[in-house]
Amino acid sequence: MRDFAAIDFETANNERTSVCSVGVVIVKDGEIVDTFYSLIQPEPNYYNYWCSQVHGLTREDTEEAPVFPEVWAQIEPLIEGLPLVAHNKAFDESCLKAVFRCYQMDYPDYQFYCTCVASRKAFPQLPNHQLHTVSEYCGYHLANHHHALADAEACAWIAREIL
């Protein structure tokens, strides 16, 4: 796959609507041509301990952040006509659909691919297929795991190798 948008969400709590950050990496002709990152005010607007432990974000980080529709208005032109790629499609696609429903936005039925599923087929010998393991195997060192843009970059790197 040579043209796509890799996307990653982090959530504030266990609600899929609680996206608190997003990273997007645009790949055209196999090259990264653009990136986007934003904090997002989550809905519902509370952080649970475990989610904050994973990504390091807290309510203070996002209290002045834009809400999802404002952020998506910036992302939409970047991804127009591109399939979306995520390392755990089940999570990221469900977040995207949930937050669209939450804000009563029409969901455009994006075409989604999963690098995690693809990596299980491409690299069955790996001890696991977590993002950092697969990206390292593909030659990308994921230094800031669970930062949405860093995770989207790692996903893009993997997708260029195996999709």
Q: What residue ranges belong to the model's regions?
A:
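Conserved non-catalytic scaffold segment of RNase H-like nuclease domains
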Residues: M1-D109, P124-N128, H132-H146
